[in-house]
Amino acid sequence: MGLRAAIIGAGQTRFGAVPDGPRALLRTSVDRAVASVDRGLDRDRIGAAFLATLGFGGWQIGNAAALFAEEAGIPGVAAVRIENACASGGFALQAAVAAIASGATELALVAGLEKMTDVSSARRRYWLGVSGDTEWERQAGLTFAGVYGLIASRYLALHAVPPEALAEVAVKNHANGALNPNAHFQKEISREAALAAPRVADPLGLYDCCPVSDGAATVLLASAETARRYTDTPVYIDGLGAASDHLAVQERPEPTRFEASRRAADAAFRAADCRPSDLSFAEL
């Protein structure tokens, strides 16, 4: 309990191409998180709120945090929007833990939201494109899939991995999705289907790339000292880490080594005073 914070509730919507707008998605995920708290929770006790979103479609981009607080049923609470591309949710959680650890609040709300499917392909490409390097990579015509296609090609060559091995990851991911009623894709695929899928950015095929999706997820955090007022099974956050790296891939000494991930993981292990060998479950 080194960070003195614990998760006491969580809720999410189904992910996929859904008819709900961003307001409804936020409301649903927050309501489900509050309902999941074993002994109930008075929203008036929430002292801080953090929203992670890239802001697709122009949905209240300039002041999404105020919209978040309103839809969460906590208008007036200090709310912050955090946009760090794919790491937005992790950094929002870190900010909430820091707020609790500092004593600024005993309860914090963290939500992640994207509404991506009902805007044009051109607008989606723009928002994804400006999440990477815009001075060099974007001007050269590189997309996110293109960047990771280059990284994957180098990795396969560097470690003598056959391209067919990538299909096993897609098969595993779809098998997990088939068991999750909230997953975007809820059916298994065969290795043959993954290998035969159209190429997006060689060696990455259709099943190797993430889809655009709609959905929201929320967690409620409490201080470690008060967590058991709300539940007998709080999930204590023992370690947390964050880092950054060169934005442009060509500036990285070795593109296949994600140094930000390594540094963040090292910081989390140090905070929790444990090693990778101590873990029984990991998700990347």
Segment roles from a protein language model:
Residues 1-23, 27-28, 134, 157, ...:
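Condensing-enzyme catalytic core mediating Claisen C-C bond formation in acyl metabolism
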Residues 284:
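Active-site pocket-lining segment
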Residues 84-114, 145-179, 219-225:
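Active-site-proximal alpha-helical scaffold in enzymes
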Residues 44, 103, 228-230:
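A cross-taxa feature marking solvent-exposed loop/turn segments within ectodomains of secreted
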Residues 1-87, 95, 155-162, 184-193, ...:
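Conserved active-site "lid/cap" helical segment
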Residues 5-6, 47-49, 78-80, 106-109, ...:
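Structural motif
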Residues 2-3, 55-107, 115-147, 185-211, ...:
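Conserved catalytic cysteine-centered active-site region
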Residues 52, 169-173, 240:
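Short acidic/histidine-centered micro-motifs embedded in hydrophobic/aromatic stretches
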